[in-house]
Each structure stands twice: as structure tokens, then as C-alpha cells.
Amino acid sequence: MKKWLEKVDWIYVIVPLALLGTFWVIAAFAGQWPWQSNPYNSYALQTDSWLKGRLDLGQNYEWLELAIYQGKYFVSFPPFPSYVLIPFVVLFGTNTPDHLIALAVTIIGCIYAVKLYREASAEKQHSLFWVLMLYFASGYLFVGMNGYVWFIAQSMSFTLSLMALYYTLRNKGGLALAFWACAVGCRPMLALYGILLVYLLVKGYKKENPKGTVWQLVKEK
């Protein structure tokens, strides 16, 4: 047991627990618990419509931000989160546990934030401090615990961007660009982020293969 505990990389325990504890305190004061229903569930409604064979929502929801075209009502936000919700809509219908999904996305993000910092920095002993600052010294906390349509897309785009950058630094171009594309499907302005990823991928490949070409990079990665 002692040997097993010595092998545990505790930062991967401390950071998620710190976030979950903070979210619990915020929820206690705000009265917004992660298992509560989500009135702004545009993505669940969109996914449900897809599974029923249509692109529009079938009716108006006055409290949601919808696009109206030829008398039909459509979700006006980028659609990637709706793909993530497919298995949840199959199980729960439109009453998906969006706040819990947002929490899970945030936890995955903080794990990749640790991995990214350790990949990018030589001062690995400071990773706990800087990862906590990334989440606690920004406006992310409210976003990260909230499953409303605007915020869950932000959470997913942030986590997917961290994953894309991590795999870029690991010179895994396929994974990096796949996660980047998913991030763009949450927030289209992240398309500009692709320029940085391609630059870093080419730079990393040239470092490993000084005589390699960009075409070889495309074929290999």
C-alpha cells in the first residue's frame, strides 16, 4: 500500500479536488447544484431533434437564443457540444445532466493543464501553483460549473484547446488538429489558433527531422 501511494502523482488528485471543493462552496451559496435541471438546454434540444430526423427544433422556445429561418427554429450556436450529448440524450432525453457534464469537462481540462505545463516548462515543480492560478485567478470558475448553453461550449472549447496544444507539443499532429477542430466547433474564433498549432507542429518536426519536409510531416502525422 505504501509503495502504491508513493507512485501516485498527487497533483492529479489535488487539482481536481481543489476545483470540486470550490465548486461545492459556490453551489452552496448560489443554490445551483450540478444535478439540477438546465433550462438553457439548447444543445440537448438540438441533439433530440437530430435523433428524430430533423435539423430544426420543431417549435419555439422563447427563453432561448434561436435562429428563425422560413418559420423554423434552429439553435444558433456552433454544434459540436450537441454531438457530445448524443449518448446522454439517448439515455435521459432532453433532461441531460449538463452541469455534471460541464464539471467532467473541467476536470479533464485541469488534468491536461498539468500535462501541458509539464510538457512546456522546465520548472515542473511549479505546475501545481500555475495550474491552480489558471483556474482560480481567471473568470473560469463560474463557467466551469455551469451547463447553460453558452458556458458548456466555453468549457469544452477551453479543455479541447488545452488538449490540442498538449498533443501539438508532443508532436502528435493528428490528435492535435482533431481536438482543435472540435474546439472550433464550440467557438469558431479558435480557428485562428490553428496557425499557432501548425507552426509548433512544423517546428517540432523540423527539430526531430532537420532534413524533413512539410509534406513528410503531413503524411506521417
Task: Enumerate the language-model features and the residues they cover.
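Transmembrane-helix motifs of polytopic, lipid-linked glycan transferases
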Residues: 94-124, 163
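Perimembrane helix-loop-helix junctions
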Residues: 192-221
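Start-transfer (signal-anchor) and selected internal transmembrane alpha helices
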Residues: 1-38, 128
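Membrane-interface transmembrane helices that cradle and orient dolichyl/undecaprenyl
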Residues: 121, 161-175, 207
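Short hydrophobic/aromatic helix or loop-helix immediately within or flanking a transmembrane segment
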Residues: 48, 64-93, 155
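Multi-pass, polyprenyl lipid-linked donor-dependent membrane glycosyltransferases
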Residues: 101-104, 132, 140-168, 182-193
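Interfacial juxtamembrane loops and adjacent helix segments
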Residues: 40, 44, 52-77, 117, ...
